């Protein structure tokens, strides 16, 4: 039985250099190889013309460059593209490309499903199967870049920003997310600015501290409620890491960070008559008074079976005006890709749910139906 080949997309520069040392090669050879992979999108060692033939043969014998494949894609009327990415065992995660005039953002997944149970999120209702590997995370960027077209002559990449806001909670997969983001930031990797790579979290506080010790990227935090009582329902991880503990962790992170320029982005999904009253806006402003931030209000994007509705424009407007009275910077996110279920909270993929969450939900619904009948 032949030995399994090393997928080079799993290796950050430190690991890549260690591999080359094991091959008896100098560190700069690893840098050359990474440039071929991430700047020019090359996966065939024979195309790497500044690497000698003997080394190319060694690499071909021991290594491979394999990104997950695109199973299908849908294009929105606004230009947003949602990709279904095959990650084995019949499972898919979803990745979303969002083009704008001044940037091109890719929303990347970190898990097959999600282990958290946020009640307004479609991904959470699908359950959880496993963490994505480094190659499956960076492979989403690599594969979509291929789809959009690497600039072979200049090395210019078609993606300018990456947000870890797809399927999954990134802080529950730190072992793979940290090296993946290292590759995104590395000059020989995707060469993105730390201000153009954003990680979004629902508040796994110990892992947030570990992230802050490991690297510096922009941080977005999913708050979604102005108090623990409501957040316990909407974002159940709050029962383990309540708001004040989460906010203290956020302040520790931004104290270390240059990428955040001294403040964090607060994400707040607007749920009709659930968390969108003017009283709750005052409460949110008071909650955030000691945590430098800008607030991103996200109109809820319904999905089949969702128990919530989207706040009206007038309620969102009143809510935002209250926050601005406190001197907060407020942005109402423009919904992108909702006609193809690619908007915030709508990603579902195709998941073999190890948590059996959907099955349990259906059983509960059947029990309720029997009781009512």
UniProtKB/Swiss-Prot annotation:
Its EC number is 2.1.1.192. It catalyses: adenosine(2503) in 23S rRNA + 2 reduced [2Fe-2S]-[ferredoxin] + 2 S-adenosyl-L-methionine = 2-methyladenosine(2503) in 23S rRNA + 5'-deoxyadenosine + L-methionine + 2 oxidized [2Fe-2S]-[ferredoxin] + S-adenosyl-L-homocysteine; adenosine(37) in tRNA + 2 reduced [2Fe-2S]-[ferredoxin] + 2 S-adenosyl-L-methionine = 2-methyladenosine(37) in tRNA + 5'-deoxyadenosine + L-methionine + 2 oxidized [2Fe-2S]-[ferredoxin] + S-adenosyl-L-homocysteine. Binds 1 [4Fe-4S] cluster. The cluster is coordinated with 3 cysteines and an exchangeable S-adenosyl-L-methionine. The keyword Manganese does not apply. The active site is at 94 (proton acceptor), 344 (s-methylcysteine intermediate). This is Dual-specificity RNA methyltransferase RlmN. It holds the Pfam family Radical_SAM. It is found in: Cytoplasm. Belongs to the radical SAM superfamily. RlmN family. Residues 100-339 form the Radical SAM core domain. Specifically methylates position 2 of adenine 2503 in 23S rRNA and position 2 of adenine 37 in tRNAs. m2A2503 modification seems to play a crucial role in the proofreading step occurring at the peptidyl transferase center and thus would serve to optimize ribosomal fidelity. Disulfide bonds join 107-344. One of its GO terms (biological process) is tRNA methylation. S-adenosyl-L-methionine binds at residues 168-169, 200, 222-224, 301. InterPro entries: Aldolase_TIM, Methyltransferase_A, RlmN_N, RNA_MTrfase_RlmN, rRNA_lsu_MTrfase_RlmN/Cfr, rSAM. The keyword Hydrolase does not apply. GO terms for cellular component: cytoplasm. Its cofactor is [4Fe-4S] cluster. Keywords: 4Fe-4S, Cytoplasm, Disulfide bond, Iron, Iron-sulfur, Metal-binding, Methyltransferase, rRNA processing, S-adenosyl-L-methionine, Transferase, tRNA processing. GO terms for molecular function: 4 iron, 4 sulfur cluster binding; metal ion binding; rRNA (adenine(2503)-C2-)-methyltransferase activity; rRNA binding; tRNA (adenine(37)-C2)-methyltransferase activity; tRNA binding. Reaction proceeds by a ping-pong mechanism involving intermediate methylation of a conserved cysteine residue. [4Fe-4S] cluster binds at residues 114, 118, 121. NCBIfam families: PRK11194.1, rRNA_mod_RlmN.
């Amino acid at each position: 039985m032949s030995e399994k080949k090393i997928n080079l997309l799993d290796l950050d520069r430190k690991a890549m250099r260690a591999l080359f040392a094991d091959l008896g090669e100098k560190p700069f050879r690893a840098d050359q190889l990474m440039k071929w992979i991430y700047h020019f999108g090359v996966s065939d060692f024979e195309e790497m013309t500044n690497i000698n033939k003997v080394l190319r043969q060694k690499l071909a014998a021991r290594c491979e460059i394999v990104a997950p494949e695109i199973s299908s894609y849908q294009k929105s009327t606004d230009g947003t593209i949602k990709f279904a990415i095959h990650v084995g065992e019949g499972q898919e995660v979803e990745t979303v490309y969002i083009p704008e005039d001044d940037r091109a953002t890719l929303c990347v997944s970190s898990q097959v499903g999600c282990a958290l149970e946020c009640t307004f999120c479609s991904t959470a209702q699908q359950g959880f199967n496993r963490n994505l590997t480094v190659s499956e995370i960076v492979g989403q960027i690599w594969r979509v870049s291929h789809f959009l077209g690497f600039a072979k002559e200049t090395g210019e990449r078609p993606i300018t920003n990456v947000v870890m806001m797809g399927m999954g909670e990134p802080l529950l997969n730190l072992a793979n997310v940290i090296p993946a983001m290292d590759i995104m930031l590395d000059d020989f990797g995707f060469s993105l600015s730390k201000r153009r790579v954003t990680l979004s979290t629902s508040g796994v506080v110990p892992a947030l501290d570990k992230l802050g010790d490991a690297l510096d990227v922009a941080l977005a935090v999913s708050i979604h409620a102005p108090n623990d009582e409501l957040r316990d329902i909407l974002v159940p991880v709050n029962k383990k890491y309540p708001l004040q503990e989460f906010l203290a962790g956020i302040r520790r992170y931004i104290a270390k960070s240059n990428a955040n320029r001294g403040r964090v982005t607060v994400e707040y999904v607007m749920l009709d008559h659930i968390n969108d009253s003017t009283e709750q806006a005052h409460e949110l402003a008071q909650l955030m008074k000691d945590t430098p931030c800008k607030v991103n209000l996200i109109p809820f994007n319904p999905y089949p079976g969702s128990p919530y509705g989207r706040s009206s424009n007038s309620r969102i407007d009143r809510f935002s005006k209250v926050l601005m009275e406190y001197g907060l910077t407020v942005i109402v996110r423009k919904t992108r890709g909702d006609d193809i279920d690619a908007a915030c909270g709508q990603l579902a993929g195709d998941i073999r749910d190890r948590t059996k969450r959907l099955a349990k939900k259906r059983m509960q619904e059947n029990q309720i139906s029997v009781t009512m009948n």
